[in-house]
Amino acid sequence: MNIRPLHDRIVVRRVEEEQKTAGGILLPGSAQEKPSQGEILAVGNGQIRENGEVRALDVKVGDKVLFGQYAGQTVKVNGEELLIMKESDVLGVLEG
């Protein structure tokens, strides 16, 4: 099963972050925060404006993005946990 987001929504796979603290302490799973960055897997066709025009999204498939800790809705697709969120939930695109 694949998922195709509608309108201004995007599908994001969380990117796992380091599981150690800066001091080298290994964190157990229960103490780890969910990562707030990920890779965009799919994008909708754009935001529908009040006049009916569709504005293309600024993000694209493959972009690495930052988002808020509670952004989006978690879904399972083919056993993989993904996030569906609006483009406006994205705080920024990681470059370089």
From Swiss-Prot:
| Superkingdom in the source lineage | Bacteria
For this UniProt record, the keywords arranged alphabetically read as follows: Chaperone, Cytoplasm
Is Transmembrane included in the keywords of this UniProt record? no
Record's subcellular location: Cytoplasm
In Gene Ontology terms, what is one molecular function of this protein?
Answer: ATP binding
A cellular-component GO term for this protein? cytoplasm
Q: Which PROSITE patterns match?
A: CHAPERONINS_CPN10 (PS00681)
Q: What is its main location?
A: cytoplasm
Example GO biological process term? chaperone cofactor-dependent protein refolding
Q: Family per UniProt?
A: Belongs to the GroES chaperonin family.
**Described purpose of this protein according to its UniProt entry:** Together with the chaperonin GroEL, plays an essential role in assisting protein folding. The GroEL-GroES system forms a nano-cage that allows encapsulation of the non-native substrate proteins and provides a physical environment optimized to promote and accelerate protein folding. GroES binds to the apical surface of the GroEL ring, thereby capping the opening of the GroEL channel.
Question: How does the record describe its quaternary structure?
Answer: Heptamer of 7 subunits arranged in a ring. Interacts with the chaperonin GroEL.
What name does the UniProt record give this protein?
A: Co-chaperonin GroES
